[in-house]
């Protein structure tokens, strides 16, 4: 007797019974249940408590509902227990599906695939990425092409956008509903003007049919993506707003400018953004107290011809070369893919950076005093790509001698703090290895490497428009908790 072989189901096959189960309920109640579940999850302080609720699966429930037409749903009200049943069914179904059966992925990429969707719900929530946008604006002239691209997209002065966004950022984890109370909305409108507020709401609120159309095309990579709804932090249907939790809103706001630049396809604006980010990175490195060579310095000192790195730090025990790239997590970057696909995606960023760093390293090694010193090649990215060890991307023959590390600017700033004057760079290798280990083993960030900077009303005052109503602004600051202790 021949036994039939039961083949694992595909992603679409796996989620179909979950979607059928969801369709037994009223459409609004499904969206409400998912939204409330994510809001309640945000209120849990400990990351382990948040993780235990599988909030990233609840996000997928919302995505699948938004992809459906409301007419496909019935009339029973979905309870939180009903939602949990859908979450568990999806979790268990995916566990047994074929989405895990892609062979040949290096261990770091497999770990990334397993954990990437969970990370936003387990990270410490600092405001470093938000603060960098303020710093970026301070570097731009009023007629900058980059400023024009950003402001054309948001429909207001970029500083005003960040002012308004900060109040939502502060309310995202606890009290997001307060922002839409009539008194709060009235105060916002008085402070910033009705035109600015209308423009801002257009950037964060998306009609259901628009979100559904954008989500129409999908594959199994959807299951592994972080913040699948970051483009639509609020969705509107028949006058009701649905909110998908703090991680989605934070991601939307913190990377607003870099996303705008990436989608605009404007070479001048893109270059201006990269120049500003490069300058910011250089200033962060100089905080270490060690001499920092910029590209011109590196070319002169080591007679570098061809591709060159942005920065170099030289110490008695090590040489570190840095290349800065404006790259961060987004939906066009696969969460689960082959090495070759990642190489294609990173051809103009990470792989190009590696070529620049390798060329500099080869020139440095020609100088006798550097022959036996370790050279660390570091690619600094705008956001954390969570790629773990990078040898699968850069399998060049010098890999063992000159390891390549991909660090976000947040991680780099954490390292800079660790090597402030009084600490030698002899320990840098261990610090870099810690970052790699953090990605590979503890990507849930139980010991987060996060931004060192906090911004409160101090940063708000930096971008505050003096033409705004000061009394209204002070009222908003007190309502939003903008006067929190700077150690927060």
Residue ranges and their predicted role:
Residues 320-322, 378-380, 405:
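Hydrophobic/aromatic beta-strand patches that form the interior of the parallel beta-sheet core
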Residues 1-275, 279, 283-288, 316, ...:
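Acidic, metal-dependent phosphodiester-chemistry machinery of nucleic-acid enzymes
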Residues 286-307, 311-314:
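A short acidic/basic microdomain associated with nuclease active sites
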Residues 328-329, 384-387:
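Short acidic, S/G/P-rich loop/turn micro-motifs used as interaction or catalytic elements
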Residues 326-378:
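Catalytic cores of nucleic-acid endonucleases
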Residues 281, 307-311, 322:
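Extended, hydrophobic alpha-helical segments in both membrane/secreted and soluble proteins
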Residues 274, 278, 304, 315, ...:
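Active-site-proximal structural scaffolding
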Residues 313-333:
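Active-site beta-strand-loop-beta-strand hairpin of nuclease catalytic cores
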